[in-house]
Amino acid sequence: MDVVEVAGSWWAQEREDIIMKYEKGHRAGLPEDKGPKPFRSYNNNVDHLGIVHETELPPLTAREAKQIRREISRKSKWVDMLGDWEKYKSSRKLIDRAYKGMPMNIRGPMWSVLLNTEEMKMKNPGRYQIMKEKGKRSSEHIQRIDRDVSGTLRKHIFFRDRYGTKQRELLHILLAYEEYNPEVGYCRDLSHIAALFLLYLPEEDAFWALVQLLASERHSLQGFHSPNGGTVQGLQDQQEHVVATSQPKTMGHQDKKDLCGQCSPLGCLIRILIDGISLGLTLRLWDVYLVEGEQALMPITRIAFKVQQKRLTKTSRCGPWARFCNRFVDTWARDEDTVLKHLRASMKKLTRKQGDLPPPAKPEQGSSASRPVPASRGGKTLCKGDRQAPPGPPARFPRPIWSASPPRAPRSSTPCPGGAVREDTYPVGTQGVPSPALAQGGPQGSWRFLQWNSMPRLPTDLDVEGPWFRHYDFRQSCWVRAISQEDQLAPCWQAEHPAERVRSAFAAPSTDSDQGTPFRARDEQQCAPTSGPCLCGLHLESSQFPPGF
């Protein structure tokens, strides 16, 4: 038996052992001579969200009791909207009530309607069971999935028991999705998203909700996990413009310290929305995100920059975004209603200025080809290693704002080595005048709204008790993988300047490639288990949990 066969049999046995532990339940791995686990009542230690606390919860305050009464009174309004969904699905009243908060026992049916899970179940009868069984037999990332499942929402009463019912359902969903969508495969963030769905939806409904969330153009979440991250790039470019307009001092400090816009916190925004804040606020922000779509991402990021403005202006270059991810959590360490009120105001302001979404992408955007480097803002200090676009004739028009840029028509195209083509684009009607921003890119896909239909039902209603607490704390450290912009521009620039290409052949050899080799090897080694980059190149180390988890 050769080495390949031995390794294959070992992986198969390891996969079977993991599946068997989940089939046995929460007693898996314990000695057989141990008696039954003593029953422990959590009645006085579980808050209204299902978070288990170490000590008994204090009595309800007057403010908390008022919030509970308000949530109960809103329940009838949401039931009426679900009963007449065709009338309310595109109404302003739905958005207004989403910002005020969904009642807990309405959240499951509303999420199911927003993501249209019932229609997907009807169109694909029995497919989830098939994908789940295939994942059990052939999953390549089952060890990683098992490790992430063990650390997902461990302070929630549903996921507290190792190899318990909800952990088994979460494992099945992730295995099935790995088979259902090989382009995404498995990323660590999917376990947290699926766990949120499992709080209010049954297993199969939670699977189709995850499928719809990543497949919907309205939410554009697959761009954060798929290899072609055009959505992420467009949102980052738009964020750079919005933050520079609303907080010029903050962006000026970033430019001064060589903090590139590509290192912005938008890449880790989804993770922070999942496990960086209290569960109560997480659910309310996800309510808004499911109703509003990707329009909600930019206002949330803008609020975070605004609240953290003083800290950001004091951030040095040494590990800035690793510390920012931890400080970003302090943005939401406040009353839920206050955060949602500021979020609504920011949403209205950006919508009025048409800055809530990036402009539509060009046909070539979103592919695996390298993106052209956007022209720098006025007064911006380029990051080390960056190079401006080749010099051209002086521009006669100021650079248009993203939200109001005129339509552009291609003037000429320049073939580049490797088959890529770069187009010099100009505003329509000014084909003879070069534009100051050459071939600026945007995200992939169109940002149009999708109509909802279908009507589901469900899920469970938890007991209403004390205040919410943070469900767990992470010790996060991250490193950011940046794409060399010199490598992007050099082939196209040399195609237009053959003389410079000849001179560069006799120039002293650069040491950039030698220096970048170990970093590329480290990138490939860190990202090898996944079939796509995790949150636009942001790698987060494993979470640290107390002993016994």
From Swiss-Prot:
Q: Lipid moiety-binding region for S-palmitoyl cysteine? A: C318, C325
> Where in the numbering of this chain does the Rab-GAP TBC domain appear?
101-293
Q: Which PROSITE patterns match?
A: TBC_RABGAP
Q: Which SUPFAM superfamilies match?
A: Ypt/Rab-GAP domain of gyp1p (SSF47923)
**Lineage: superkingdom:** Eukaryota
Q: What is the membrane topology here?
A: Lipid-anchor
Q: Where is this region: Disordered?
A: 350-443, 507-526
Write out the entry's keywords from A to Z.
Answer: Cell membrane, GTPase activation, Lipoprotein, Membrane, Palmitate, Ubl conjugation
Pfam families, A to Z: RabGAP-TBC (PF00566)
Record PTM text: Ubiquitinated by a CUL7-based E3 ligase, which leads to proteasomal degradation.
Recorded GO MF terms: GTPase activator activity
Q: Where in the cell is it found?
A: Cell membrane
Keyword Disulfide bond set for record:
no
Question: What is one cellular component GO term in this UniProt entry?
Answer: plasma membrane
Supply the InterPro entries for this chain.
Rab-GAP-TBC_dom, Rab-GAP_TBC_sf, Rab_GAP_TBC_domain
Q: According to its UniProt record, where is this protein mainly located?
A: membrane
State where composition is biased (Low complexity): 398-417
The miscellaneous comment for this protein is: TBC1D3 is encoded by a collection of very similar paralogs with multiple copies of each paralog, some human genomes encoding well over 50 copies depending on ethnic origin of the donor.
Function statement: Acts as a GTPase activating protein for RAB5. Does not act on RAB4 or RAB11.
Q: What is this protein called?
A: TBC1 domain family member 3I
Q: Per the UniProt entry, what species is this protein from, by scientific name?
A: Homo sapiens
**Which gene name belongs to this protein?**
TBC1D3I
